[in-house]
Structures are given as structure tokens and as C-alpha cells.
């Protein structure tokens, strides 16, 4: 496992309120393909209220962010043009920090994900030290 974090509605203000990452996922670490530090970005995304891009697969409300394209399963590489939910709009978000793509592939959050993190911060983390 490269890292983990609790969602803010489950742990904010408790001893479980933290982000944990494997040192090998940090720059210079031994987790080949996953050692540029993007695991930390991914886990902070969870800590700020984001689900995986593949949450719920091709059905339902997915990651609860409307501008994140649906994805049936995680991407462990960087397959451009991948579309595991052809009946849903958009290609798989392989460049999104909340997928499992290689660190070299992860470059973005959607605008909706940023709004969700802002909302979660205001609700669960604002004013905490």
C-alpha cells in the first residue's frame, strides 16, 4: 500500500485525522512509477473529501463530482484515450490525481473536485490547527 487517509466526515478532529504515505512513494523512493510524490496529493484529495475517479464504476453518481468522467476501473498506467464507460460522456480521467495512474501521468483535479475540496475544508477543517 502506498498511502491512505480518512475522509473528513469520518475523522476530522480525531486522532485518526491524518494522511499517511509510504516513504517509497516520495521522490527518490523505490516504488517505481509511483515515486514522484503524487500518492501524497492523491491521499490529501481523500482527506479533503474526494473519492476515486472510478467510484461506482459506470453506473450511479460516481465520485459525486459532475465534471469527472465515469471510469469502470482504476488505471495503473497512462493509457491515453481509454474509455471504460463508452455509454457515459468523456474519456477515462487517467490524468486525474484521484485515479491510480502512474505519477508521471497525474496532473490535474477537475474544477468540480477543487470546489468539493473547498467545501469540505470549510465544513470540516476551517479553524482547526
Feature-to-residue mapping (PLM):
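Active-site-proximal segment of zinc-dependent metalloprotease catalytic domains
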Residues: 1-55
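Short, exposed beta-strand "edge-strand" segments with a Pro/Gly-rich flavor and a Y/T-containing core
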Residues: 16-20, 102-109
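Solvent-exposed, flexible loop/coil residues
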Residues: 8-11, 23, 58, 69, ...
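General N-terminal targeting signals
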Residues: 8-10, 38, 82, 115-117, ...
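Pan-zinc metallopeptidase signature
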Residues: 105-129
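Intrinsically disordered, low-complexity segments enriched in small/polar residues
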Residues: 1-3, 11, 31, 60, ...
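The catalytic-center signature of Zn2+-dependent metalloproteases
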Residues: 34-107
Amino acid at each position: 500500500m502506498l498511502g491512505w487517509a480518512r475522509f473528513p466526515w469520518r475523522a476530522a478532529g480525531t486522532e485518526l485525522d491524518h494522511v499517511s504515505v509510504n516513504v517509497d512513494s516520495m521522490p527518490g523512493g523505490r516504488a517505481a512509477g509511483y515515486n514522484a510524490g503524487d500518492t501524497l496529493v492523491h491521499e490529501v484529495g481523500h482527506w479533503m473529501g474526494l473519492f476515486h475517479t472510478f467510484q461506482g464504476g459506470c453506473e450511479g453518481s460516481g465520485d459525486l463530482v459532475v465534471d469527472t468522467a465515469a471510469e469502470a476501473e482504476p488505471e495503473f498506467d497512462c493509457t491515453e484515450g481509454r474509455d471504460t464507460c463508452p455509454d457515459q460522456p468523456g474519456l477515462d480521467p487517467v490524468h486525474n490525481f484521484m485515479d491510480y495512474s502512474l505519477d508521471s501521468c497525474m496532473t490535474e483535479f477537475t474544477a468540480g473536485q477543487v470546489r468539493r475540496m473547498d467545501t469540505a475544508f470549510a465544513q470540516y477543517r476551517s479553524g482547526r490547527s
